[in-house]
């Protein structure tokens, strides 16, 4: 089995003798994940817990939750759920934040209930196809290297809690085959059919065209993102050292004079990583290019507003960042 082989290669991905919390929507990817984990749970001595987020986005949301709960109980899997207030999930970004917030709270609760089987892993059903969609979306928006290496196999989201995506070695066609082979129920979310949403348009219209031209294009795009990930980690390490070298007199500043002596591409890498370390969550490659151009040598003092009420300003000697809400 492919997942079992991957777990043997990286034993820290899903440690044995622990509680793992699965985010299950009821769609084909998450149900395939649940089946694979159930089949391996005895071997790895896992306590498997299912969490379902009810966004109340469509008329059958309650029905989906009830039927999924019943299926889990029949298969002797613990089931947990939360219902969202409409304001909490007004858009995709808010909905994602709501899910992760509740998943983290549930993981902490499970750990407190069983200290011998702590819940240190939260699992989602993201596949190689999801990763390919994200790469295409970020490329179209304009991104730096970090934007091409999103949806990592594992990342820390809270102290002692990692978000893990075991299905990145599968594409969506393969998760559908798993569901068919094991006769798994699949609950369709109508919101996934709305092509007015960017990701759905890529999923329904763009990726199928790419796959028809180059069979398996989604898996290869995801593979490129995976290879770039290690390169990106090396770049982050370099940027950390470079930021220390360019540190200004104040903690929220960089020396503009030191930046002048570096190449254009290195300045952009430093600026991109510096902004992220200072708390700027969303910055595009075009914005980095604009900042880099405006703070270049012989350019007059000025300022730029960024997402999240952040303000970048500069004078002759330094570049500063501040949050307008503070």
UniProtKB/Swiss-Prot annotation:
InterPro entries cross-referenced by the UniProt entry: Rossmann-like_a/b/a_fold, TilS/TtcA_N, tRNA_Ile_lys_synt, tRNA_Ile_lys_synt_N
Disulfide bridge map: none
EC number: 6.3.4.19
Superkingdom of origin: Bacteria
Pfam families assigned to the protein according to its UniProt record, in alphabetical order: ATP_bind_3
Compartments in which it is found: Cytoplasm
BP terms from Gene Ontology: tRNA modification
Keyword Ligase among UniProt keywords: yes
One GO cellular component, as annotated: cytoplasm
Catalysis: reaction(s): cytidine(34) in tRNA(Ile2) + L-lysine + ATP = lysidine(34) in tRNA(Ile2) + AMP + diphosphate + H(+)
Gene3D superfamilies noted in UniProt: HUPs
Residues that hold ATP according to the record: 25-30
Catalytic class of the enzyme: ligase
Primary location recorded for the protein, binned into one broad class: cytoplasm
Record key words, sorted: ATP-binding, Cytoplasm, Ligase, Nucleotide-binding, tRNA processing
Gene Ontology molecular-function annotations: ATP binding; tRNA(Ile)-lysidine synthase activity
UniProt free text on domains: The N-terminal region contains the highly conserved SGGXDS motif, predicted to be a P-loop motif involved in ATP binding.
Role, per record: Ligates lysine onto the cytidine present at position 34 of the AUA codon-specific tRNA(Ile) that contains the anticodon CAU, in an ATP-dependent manner. Cytidine is converted to lysidine, thus changing the amino acid specificity of the tRNA from methionine to isoleucine.
UniProt cross-references to NCBIfam families, sorted A to Z: lysidine_TilS_N (TIGR02432)
Protein family: Belongs to the tRNA(Ile)-lysidine synthase family.
UniProt cross-references to HAMAP family, sorted A to Z: tRNA_Ile_lys_synt
Protein name per UniProt: tRNA(Ile)-lysidine synthase
Gene source species: Prochlorococcus marinus (strain NATL2A)
Gene expressing this chain: tilS
């Amino acid at each position: 089995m492919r997942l079992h082989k991957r777990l043997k290669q990286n034993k820290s991905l899903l440690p044995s003798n622990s509680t793992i919390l699965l985010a299950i929507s009821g769609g084909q990817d998450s149900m395939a994940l649940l089946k694979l984990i159930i089949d391996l749970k005895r071997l790895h001595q896992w306590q498997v817990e299912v969490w379902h987020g009810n966004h109340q986005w469509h008329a059958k949301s309650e029905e989906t939750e009830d039927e999924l709960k019943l299926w889990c109980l029949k298969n002797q899997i613990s089931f947990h759920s939360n219902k969202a207030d409409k304001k909490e999930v007004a858009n995709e970004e808010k909905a994602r934040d709501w899910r992760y917030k509740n998943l983290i709270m549930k993981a902490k609760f499970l750990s407190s209930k069983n200290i011998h089987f702590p819940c240190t892993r939260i699992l989602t059903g993201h596949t190689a196809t999801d990763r390919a969609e994200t790469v295409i979306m970020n490329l179209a928006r304009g991104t730096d290297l970090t934007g091409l290496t999103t949806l990592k196999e594992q990342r820390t989201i809270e102290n002692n809690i990692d978000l893990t995506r075991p299905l990145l070695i599968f594409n969506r066609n393969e998760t559908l085959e798993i569901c068919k082979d094991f006769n798994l129920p699949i609950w369709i979310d109508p919101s996934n059919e709305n092509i007015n949403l960017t990701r759905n348009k890529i999923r329904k219209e763009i990726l199928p065209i790419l796959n028809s031209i180059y069979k398996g294009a989604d898996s290869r795009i995801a593979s490129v993102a995976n290879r770039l990930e290690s390169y990106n980690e090396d770049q982050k390490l370099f940027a950390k050292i470079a930021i220390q070298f360019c540190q200004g007199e104040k903690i929220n500043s960089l020396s503009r004079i030191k930046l002048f002596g570096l190449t254009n591409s290195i300045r952009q890498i430093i600026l991109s990583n510096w902004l992220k370390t200072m708390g700027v969550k969303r910055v595009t490659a075009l914005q980095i290019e604009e900042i880099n151009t405006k703070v270049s040598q012989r350019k007059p003092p000025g300022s730029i507003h960024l997402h999240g009420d952040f303000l970048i300003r500069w004078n002759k000697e330094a570049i500063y960042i501040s949050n307008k809400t503070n």
